[in-house]
UniProtKB/Swiss-Prot annotation:
Keyword Ion transport annotated: no
Family note: Belongs to the RecR family.
Protein name stated in the entry: Recombination protein RecR
Organism, as annotated: Phocaeicola vulgatus (strain ATCC 8482 / DSM 1447 / JCM 5826 / CCUG 4940 / NBRC 14291 / NCTC 11154) (Bacteroides vulgatus)
Functional note: May play a role in DNA repair. It seems to be involved in an RecBC-independent recombinational process of DNA repair. It may act with RecF and RecO.
Source taxon at top rank: Bacteria
PANTHER family linked: RECOMBINATION PROTEIN RECR (PTHR30446:SF0)
GO BP: DNA recombination; DNA repair
Length: 205
């Protein structure tokens, strides 16, 4: 046992929290000690919520967003514009775009971007299901809203080639987002403007 910790149980709990992205051991220690001070019912509710989420959460069969049902609330909402699809990397990006209140279409979550260095290729992403949605004929515009990174640009280009020849407008969010920035960390105003001011994708955006 690390002599820094008075308890092996505490050390183990801190170690588990420290596995979370963006959580160092100091932050993990604060979180664990905070939970330790709470009533047992509070801690059990926290744990049960995580277990229930893991076992019962679903992924939308249409867009791959997280959902409580087979089809997410966005895809099943008749008030949304089904002729427009905003392509994003992750579920967090859907939440970021929704927070802008500037977009009323549907989404398509790829589950990542093409990154050979990380061993992620096109077949590891939800690209073919996007192509199938466009082939359905109802989609008139696909908005590429991936991060302004080399991997994001590579994925944009690949998608553009897959959709080449189809009767669909392909656009990309405006570059109000700095190069290298990830969508989820962009402020709502900037992201909203980037969507509104989107431009046609030329392969060099």
């Amino acid at each position: 046992m690390n002599q820094q910790y008075p308890s092996m149980l505490l050390e183990k709990a801190v170690g588990e929290f420290a596995k979370l992205p963006g959580v160092g051991r100091k932050t993990a220690m604060r979180l664990v000690l905070h939970l330790l001070r709470q009533d047992t019912a509070v801690v059990e509710a926290f744990g049960n919520a995580m277990i229930t989420l893991k076992h019962e959460v679903k992924y939308c069969k249409v867009c791959h967003n997280i959902s409580d049902t087979e089809t997410c609330r966005i895809c099943s909402n008749p008030a949304r514009d089904a002729s427009t699809i905003c392509v994003v990397e992750s579920i967090r990006d859907v939440m970021a775009v929704e927070a802008t209140q500037q977009y009323r279409g549907l989404y398509h979550v790829l589950g990542g971007v093409i990154s050979p260095m990380d061993g992620i290729g096109p077949s590891d992403l939800q690209i073919e299901s996007l192509v199938e949605r466009v082939k359905g004929g109802e989609v008139k515009e696909v908005i590429l809203a991936l991060s302004s990174t080399m991997e994001g640009d590579t994925t944009n280009f690949y998608i553009s080639r897959k959709l080449d020849g189809m009767d669909v407008k392909l656009s990309v969010i405006a570059r109000g987002i700095s190069i290298g920035d990830e969508l989820e960390y962009t402020d709502e105003v900037t992201l909203g403007r980037s969507i509104i001011n989107r431009t046609l994708f030329t392969g060099t955006a």
